[in-house]
């Protein structure tokens, strides 16, 4: 899955990243490159939390859906790619390990 992100910079701050399709998911970095890396990690952590809680995964919208939103005016648009199948396997493995530690299995 590819989630659109918007990178923004205020004069007195580092580069901030917002993920419009994942409410409350944000990140930052000192450079654009660092912001992109941190954004990918933030999206992965956000989705991992949803999977652990058995919550639905929001489908990403096309960037063009968000570009007309005035909240994101002047931002740099990119996408981050997440291998949802691999993440789901990792979460399933974590759940099994957690259950075995409390002798449920």
Where are these regions (language model features)?
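N-terminal segment of the canonical double-stranded RNA-binding domain
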Residues: 1-14, 18
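A short, exposed loop/beta-hairpin motif centered on an aromatic-Gly-Thr core
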Residues: 23-34
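Short, charged/polar surface micro-motifs in flexible loops or helix N-caps
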Residues: 22-23, 84
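Short aromatic/hydrophobic contact patches that present stacked aromatics
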Residues: 16, 26, 96
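A generic "binding-loop/recognition-motif" signal
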Residues: 13, 22, 103
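Short glycine-enriched loop/turn motifs at secondary-structure junctions
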Residues: 19-21, 90-91
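Short, charged, surface-exposed hinge/linker loops at domain edges
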Residues: 1-2, 41-105
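Conserved anionic group-binding/transfer micro-motifs
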Residues: 35, 39
């Amino acid at each position: 899955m590819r989630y659109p992100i918007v990178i923004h910079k205020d004069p007195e701050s580092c580069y901030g990243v917002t993920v419009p399709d994942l409410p409350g998911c944000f990140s930052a970095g000192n450079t654009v490159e660092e912001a992109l890396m941190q954004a990918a990690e933030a999206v992965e952590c956000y989705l991992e939390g949803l999977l652990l809680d058995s919550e639905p995964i929001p489908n990403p919208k096309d960037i063009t859906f968000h570009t007309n939103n005035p909240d994101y005016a002047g931002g740099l648009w990119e996408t981050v790619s997440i291998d949802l199948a691999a993440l789901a396997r990792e979460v399933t493995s974590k759940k099994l390990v957690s259950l075995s530690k409390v002798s449920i299995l």
